[in-house]
A protein has these predicted regions:
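A short beta-alpha structural unit
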Residues: 54-58, 175-177
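Glycine-rich loop/hinge motif
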Residues: 164-199
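Short, conserved, surface-exposed binding loops centered on an aromatic residue
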Residues: 59-60, 193
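Extended, non-catalytic substrate-recognition/exosite surfaces adjacent to catalytic cores, especially
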Residues: 66
């Protein structure tokens, strides 16, 4: 039974950092990197005294497999359980998750962790994240509880990294537009103002 349930993750115990490390391997074209928390240390004068450099551990999947998984993850956000992870102008890949908590004594109540793992942009990832809700009060999954948080984080990260949004036609048509104030203007003035605003 354990071997069969392992295929959908119900017998394996992972830490969040292990899950993120695997997610990053998918984002990195299949190369597993040693995880680290501190990027660099600066002294009181603002000089960098220590810089962490990424360390490759090994290749765990092929680049082709990595690309296919990223495409499937994008499909989870575009058409699947991760729709709430969508961010207009950015291609987000994601995977919703529900985990059963392992404990020696839980009584009769099974406890869960819900999650959403995301990468962005999915075609050339710069950011990977894992949003977790431990023992949610509501009977909702990672797509409902965690994906909206991931969308907010992705949007901020993309802005901080100066990654410009690239809107498809549908997204462009749904963008809000600023309309000039036309109240109290004559028809001629209103028309000129509207034309000046490309309306």
């Amino acid at each position: 039974v354990e071997l069969s349930s392992a295929s959908f993750g119900q017998s394996n115990s992972l830490t969040p950092i292990q899950l993120c490390t695997g997610l990053c391997a998918i984002a990195n074209g299949g190369t597993l990197l040693k995880p680290y928390v501190v990027d660099h240390i600066i002294d009181s004068n603002g000089n960098t005294v220590k810089k962490t450099t990424p360390t490759e551990v090994r290749r765990v999947i092929s680049e082709d497999t990595s690309e296919k998984v990223r495409t499937m993850m994008k499909g989870v956000v575009d058409n699947g359980t991760g729709k709430n992870g969508y961010v207009a102008g950015y291609r987000v890949g994601g995977k919703t998750g529900t985990s059963t908590k392992l404990a020696e004594s839980q009584g009769d109540k099974t406890k869960y962790i819900v999650s959403f793992a995301a990468i962005a942009p999915s075609d050339d990832p710069e950011v990977a994240m894992l949003i977790i809700v431990d023992e949610p009060n509501q009977d909702l999954g990672g797509g409902a509880l965690c994906a909206p948080v991931a969308a907010q984080v992705v949007e901020v990260c993309m802005q901080e990294l100066n990654i410009e949004p690239v809107y498809d036609e549908e997204e462009t048509n749904n963008l809000p537009i600023d309309t000039p104030m036309l109240i109290g203007k004559t028809v001629v003035d209103a028309k000129q103002t509207a034309q000046a605003s490309n309306l």
